[in-house]
């Protein structure tokens, strides 16, 4: 049976994310990373496809008669300056998870690095392997893809900072402090970004992803991730896709939230044993 373009896109997306997760897991094993991921062995057996970046352009849209299109009111707002009366308490703005407004703001392009003394004083917690990964892809409608300077400016405004594994991370604080809420990788292998060549950088797509277990408040972190992806798609002419590269609908967003609820329920059950 012939494999179509859509299937290749899905396979390539899985390979990219799997590679990033494996690198994070390897760094954690070496004591240098903050993220620890448990990879499915089956992903390592996938064939290595050296397709050109053009294959990761906008994918064929699957018509879903029973799924409504994503509207302005379906996703959380993207700016922290709008009135808080219009939002639900469980859908924070992008700046709501800041630890402190008095914290010094680091240089935006510098990798976020913790203080060595603080790291030595804090008890080392063994993080559980990631069991689930929630993914939102943003695919450029422009045949030339997202251009580096515009992409960088957009994600910096959303609070993402360049850091470990040469990808971008959104921390609790917009200043780049606190735990990692979610990350953003290049959808083209090897999934990294080169800030030294950002002026000439282009990519057909990027992938936002959140691992479970991960942030202490995964539902709020997920809403912030949706807001960042939505902002990027609106301002840079992109299209939101789910982990299967299908159009991201309000129903898909709700399904992701339900996965978080179910995961938290399982965690509570395990703790009560």
Curated annotation (Swiss-Prot):
Belongs to the ZipA family. Residues 1 are periplasmic. Residues 61-127 are annotated as: Disordered. It is a single-pass type I membrane protein. Essential cell division protein that stabilizes the FtsZ protofilaments by cross-linking them and that serves as a cytoplasmic membrane anchor for the Z ring. Also required for the recruitment to the septal ring of downstream cell division proteins. The chain crosses the membrane at residues 2-22. The lineage of its organism: Bacteria, Pseudomonadati, Pseudomonadota, Gammaproteobacteria, Pseudomonadales. It is found in: Cell inner membrane. InterPro entries: Cell_div_ZipA, ZipA_FtsZ-bd_C, ZipA_FtsZ-bd_C_sf. Residues 23-273 are cytoplasmic. This is Cell division protein ZipA. Coiled coil: none annotated. Keywords: Cell cycle, Cell division, Cell inner membrane, Cell membrane, Membrane, Transmembrane, Transmembrane helix. Interacts with FtsZ via their C-terminal domains. Pfam families: ZipA_C. One of its GO terms (biological process) is FtsZ-dependent cytokinesis. GO terms for cellular component: cell division site; plasma membrane. Its main location: membrane.
């Amino acid at each position: 049976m012939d494999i179509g373009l859509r299937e290749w896109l899905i396979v390539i997306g899985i390979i990219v994310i799997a590679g990033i997760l494996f690198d994070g897991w390897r760094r954690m094993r070496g004591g240098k990373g903050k993220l620890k991921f448990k990879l499915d062995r089956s992903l390592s057996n996938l064939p290595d496809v050296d397709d050109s970046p053009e294959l990761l352009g906008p994918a064929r849209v699957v018509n879903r008669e029973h799924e409504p299109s994503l509207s302005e009111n379906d996703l959380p707002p993207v700016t922290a300056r709008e009135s808080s009366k219009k939002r639900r308490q469980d859908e924070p703005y992008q700046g709501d998870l800041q630890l402190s407004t008095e914290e010094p703001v680091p240089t935006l392009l510098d990798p976020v690095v913790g203080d060595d003394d603080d790291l030595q004083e804090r008890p080392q917690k063994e993080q559980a392997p990631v069991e689930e990964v929630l993914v939102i892809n943003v695919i450029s409608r422009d045949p030339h893809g997202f251009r580096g300077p515009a992409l960088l400016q957009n994600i910096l405004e959303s609070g993402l900072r360049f850091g470990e594994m040469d990808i971008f991370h959104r921390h609790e604080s917009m200043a780049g402090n606190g735990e990692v809420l979610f990350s953003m990788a290049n959808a083209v292998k090897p999934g990294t970004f080169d800030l030294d060549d950002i002026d000439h950088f282009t990519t057909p797509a990027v992938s936002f992803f959140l691992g479970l277990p991960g942030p202490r408040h995964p539902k709020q972190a997920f809403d912030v991730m949706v807001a960042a992806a939505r902002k990027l798609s609106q301002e840079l002419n992109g299209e939101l896709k789910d982990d299967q590269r299908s159009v991201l609908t309000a129903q898909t967003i709700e399904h992701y939230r339900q996965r978080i609820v179910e995961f938290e329920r399982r965690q509570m059950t395990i703790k009560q044993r």
